[in-house]
Amino acid sequence: MKLLVISSAPVVELDGKLHLYAPYEKEMQLWAKHADTIQFCCPIWKQDRKLLIAPISFEVNSIVELQEFDITSLSNKLKAIPFAFVALIKIFKAMRQADHIHLRCPGNIALLACLVQILFTNKQKTAKYAGNWDP
């Protein structure tokens, strides 16, 4: 199974190693047991922002990097338009290749993925609600 994980939760790259938010990494260990390949579609952080992280303990085949964005001010709303458009295209291309689509909600990126997944009626999908959403 080709698993695609779409999330606003970042992959953190430190010293050439990939990390995830620690509880998220434990959850993904379960998914990794049932997937032949795992692809992430999410933001990538290149520095430690004091998030509780753990090294990824399974093979990640690829990461489609998405730009983080928020809509908390007028200027951010204007900036979000091109970011969202590019994200929609990247999410669509990633979904085309996947056998199973896993949305990790809430978040702006998962919201976009919810819209795109409508086009893939025959693909298996799951959604995980992982906490509060503060756009």
Question: What are these language model-derived features?
Answer:
Residues 19-23, 82-83, 134-135:
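Nucleotide-sugar donor phosphate/pyrophosphate-binding loop at the beta->alpha transition
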Residues 35, 60, 97-99:
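Short, well-ordered alpha-helix to beta-strand connector turns
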